[in-house]
Amino acid sequence: ASSAASAVYKRQPVEQQRLEKEQIEDMGSIYRTRGAHAIHCLTVIGQVEGHVEAPQGQKTTKYEHVIPQLVAVQEDPAIEGLLVLLNTVGGDVEAGLALAELIASISKPSAAVVLGGGHSIGIPLAVSAQRSFIVPTATMTVHPVRHSGMILGVPQTMRWFEQMQERITGFVAAHSGISEKRYTELMMRTGELVMDVGTVLDGRKAVREKLIDELGGLSDALAWLYREIEGK
């Protein structure tokens, strides 16, 4: 099968091969796979970068790169489904939540797989797909919204944090099996993280808490996507 796929790739025009190689290097994505069904593969790695550029040397997923890809997934009739692979430490809250809302609004079958980590704002991204998977060794850190840099120590600032957290908690509860109450309990737990509040969930615990739908990896996600596409 691999030799056949290689032969198909070699027959492609050189320009198309070059463009696909550049897309993988620049965007971390594949326009669409060449399996039985055309699946767009999107990777969310490192830090989700939003309105402010991350420090040099950090791996990032730029939301201005991801948004056009998600629009293409919805609009292009040749693309039949979306596969999101996550290994992220989190990042810009509003940018991450915006991407999660976009993924959730795609009408085509979508699946997400949490690999190394799906921390912080990576959690809404993981549950935004129609079906979520997590490998046993992956971890997800549930903790409150944080802010780096100087802030005004006034009640209005604290209320802003509360409102942002309510948006995230509501989204996660709406797109997974966990309740807002239970998610808040995990988020505010003390004694597990050093000098912080929150909970670290491995793959099995994330499924047990109904945060993620299913324990599984790439083949499981692709099998689910194929079933959904063929069932339409």
Model region roles, listed by residue range:
Residues A5, A129-Q130, I212:
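Short, well-ordered alpha-helix to beta-strand connector turns
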Residues V44, V84, A126, M140, ...:
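Terminal peptide-recognition signature
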